[in-house]
């Protein structure tokens, strides 16, 4: 399926914040999508910033995450948005309620799906940096999120929602026409991700799974020597980029955070195929390609 670069249009915002969310990089990621594919699989879904920014088309779409509470929330947003809003409407932004909801979820108490989703969403919204563990103590009106939930419910109607291990998911959905976008837990950052096992995320296992696929993949990671070494393989493109660091902005204005975009295809192919490039406001097509190629390390 052919894609064109664009900004706005069918794009919507995510209905939630998330640790490592790709709001700041969504344009950069989407600009590097392959030109043709029929299956889009988001392996580490999180807040879904890339999926929600991607224009819906005729391709088969999959959203996956290993976090069962997160997947239940997505399913309730898609299938029971009104019931979810009713549960959320009178939830208090208080430390006492926050600790109660956290205890109920951590103890795996038997809860109706919608209530469990509401508890988890409240933990995300009322926690510090959306980490779900520490009460944020910041004012937040829950009903301000209701339009976002409604928009997300519409966008998710034709999306398959999975709750699988990343390697098993990749093997299940791999086809020559498949495109996998992967935003795994970053290296040496396991402590910030709720559903990572005590042994830590298996970065080497993900490499092995991706190198053997028939389709294409695009991977976002923190820029570090260990990840560069893991993906230093023939046919793999490693591109260094940077974004504003949201947390560091509080202490150092303009602080940049280095990231990597890793793929098994030429990420400039979509830009080369476009007559009009609307993701970029001040550069013509040749300037964009020159700038992109300059930072490629093949």
Language model regions located:
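Class I S-adenosyl-L-methionine
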Residues: 1-60, 66, 169-178, 189-298
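SAM-dependent nucleic-acid methyltransferase catalytic core
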Residues: 2-25, 31, 35, 78-192, ...
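Short alpha-helix immediately C-terminal to the canonical SAM-binding loop
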Residues: 71
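Conserved SAM-binding loop
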Residues: 74
């Amino acid at each position: 399926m052919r894609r064109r670069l664009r900004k706005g249009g069918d794009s919507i915002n995510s209905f939630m914040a998330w640790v490592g969310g790709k709001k700041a990089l969504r344009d950069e990621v989407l600009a590097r999508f392959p030109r043709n594919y029929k299956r889009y699989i988001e392996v580490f879904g999180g807040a879904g910033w890339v999926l929600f920014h991607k224009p819906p088309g005729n391709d088969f779409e999959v959203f996956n995450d290993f976090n069962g509470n997160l997947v239940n929330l997505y399913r309730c947003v898609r299938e029971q948005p009104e019931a979810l809003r009713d549960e959320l409407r009178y939830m208090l932004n208080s430390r006492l309620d926050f600790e109660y909801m956290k205890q109920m979820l951590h103890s795996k108490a038997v809860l109706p799906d919608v209530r469990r989703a509401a508890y988890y969403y409240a933990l995300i919204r009322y926690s510090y940096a959306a980490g779900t563990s520490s009460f944020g103590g910041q004012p937040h009106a829950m009903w301000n999120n209701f339009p976002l939930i409604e928009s997300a419910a519409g966008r998710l109607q034709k999306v398959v929602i999975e709750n699988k291990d990343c390697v098993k998911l990749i093997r299940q959905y791999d086809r020559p026409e498949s495109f996998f976008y992967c935003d795994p837990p970053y290296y040496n950052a396991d402590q910030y991700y709720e559903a990572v096992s005590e042994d830590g995320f298996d970065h080497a296992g993900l490499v092995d799974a991706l190198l053997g696929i028939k389709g294409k993949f695009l991977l976002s990671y923190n820029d570090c020597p260990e990840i560069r070494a893991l993906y230093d393989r023939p046919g793999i493109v490693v591109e260094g980029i940077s974004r504003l660091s949201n947390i560091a902005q509080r202490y150092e204005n303009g602080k940049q955070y280095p990231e990597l975009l890793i793929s098994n295809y030429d990420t400039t192919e979509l830009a080369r195929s476009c007559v009009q490039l609307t993701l970029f406001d001040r550069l013509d097509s040749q300037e964009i390609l020159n700038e992109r190629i300059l930072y490629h390390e093949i």
